[in-house]
Each structure stands twice: as C-alpha cells, then as structure tokens.
Curated annotation (Swiss-Prot):
The gene is E7. GO terms for cellular component: host cell cytoplasm; host cell nucleus. A zinc finger (unnamed) spans 50-86. Its main location: host cell. It comes from Human papillomavirus type 94. Keywords: Activator, DNA-binding, Early protein, G1/S host cell cycle checkpoint dysregulation by virus, Host cytoplasm, Host nucleus, Host-virus interaction, Inhibition of host innate immune response by virus, Inhibition of host interferon signaling pathway by virus, Interferon antiviral system evasion, Metal-binding, Modulation of host cell cycle by virus, Oncogene, Transcription, Transcription regulation, Viral immunoevasion, Zinc, Zinc-finger. This is Protein E7. Highly phosphorylated.
Amino acid sequence: MHGPHPTVKDIELSLAPEDIPVVCNVQLDEEDYTDVVEPAQQAYRVVTVCPKCSLPLRLVVECSHADIRALERLLLGTLKLVCPRCV
C-alpha cells in the first residue's frame, strides 16, 4: 500500500496456493529397516470343484494366515474358481 490511507485498489486478494518444496534430509539407519516384521508365509493347498462342470480344482498359494482367511471369505462369497475348459 502506498499513501497514508488504504484504498480498495491497494488491497490484493490473491489466495492462490503456493508451491512449498518438501525436503527431508533425514537418513534412516540400516537397523530401522530390520525392525519391520514380515508376516510368516506358508504354503496352503486349496481344493475345490469347478462350479460349471464339477471337475476338481487344486491350487497352491503361499501367503500369511490373515491372507488365507481373506481368500476363504472370498471363496465362501461370490468368488468362484473355474477350470480352464469352462472359461
């Protein structure tokens, strides 16, 4: 503003977002990476039948206990495994 009294033309109402650079200079030690515990992986056999032709289907998955429970919920719901012949 210039002059002893502010006028409307002297007031700038600009609310544009400003680009603020985000810089992080923190380096993690090697031991910070080793603290993360991966869930134990285990092989599970899944045996079911094709819903179209009733042929047996077998597959093996390797996952955590929580993931096999999630797969079980999907298979008990609307997810169906179909054999290659019926696709």
